[in-house]
Amino acid sequence: MGETKELFPEAVELLKKLISSPSFSKEEVKTADLIQQFLEGKQVEIHRSGNNIWAFSSNYNPSLPTVWLNSHHDTVKPNLGYTKDPFSPIIDEGKLFGLGSNDAGGPLVSLIATFCHFIGKDLPFNLLLIASAEEEISGPNGIASLISHLPKADLAIVGEPTQMRLAVAEKGLLVIDAKVHGKAGHA
């Protein structure tokens, strides 16, 4: 379906488009549309629920194990301390800067490129690509809304900027809308 030489620049262009389209949690329709258009342009049959997009490898067989490739396309809102326009992707010294480039646009487009590379190949497992919404707020319309409709994951690759370190970092989530003064940050 795709060779690495073609997929890398296509993934970078998709990431630039995702960065250029604000996609705050619950407001991801534009980025969901971009992902859908990209995959359909590769003749991938997609499924969509709200702003969640998913696709199965073309040789999907329920008797084979299933590998999930999952990342999200929503972002937090930019803080006032940004030194660059967060919606204008810039490549500087080989790094692409912009809101969501690291968490988690870069991992997402990498997984999309991986999926496109392997989709037509005869694999001993199924691939399931999931581009989920509302991850930044653990929203009810994100991946949790899809779990009961998807096949069990025998293995999952989750695109998050963790430096490949496993950690228990959250036991729950409390969302409070408040106005706070000080230096902004995102963990």
Language-model segments: residues:
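Active-site metal-coordination/substrate-binding segment of hydrolases
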Residues: L64-L128
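Acidic/histidine-rich catalytic neighborhood of metal-dependent amide-processing enzymes
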Residues: L108-V175, K179
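Conserved hydrophobic "DFG−1" position in protein kinase catalytic cores
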Residues: A55-S57, I91, V180
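Metal-dependent amide/peptide-bond hydrolase catalytic core
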Residues: M1-E6, D177-A187
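Histidine-centered active-site/metal-ligand motif
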Residues: H72, E170, H186-A187
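Residue-level marker for buried hydrophobic side chains located in beta-strands
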Residues: V67-L69, I157, K183
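N-terminal helical capping/dimerization or prosegment-like subdomains
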Residues: M1-P78
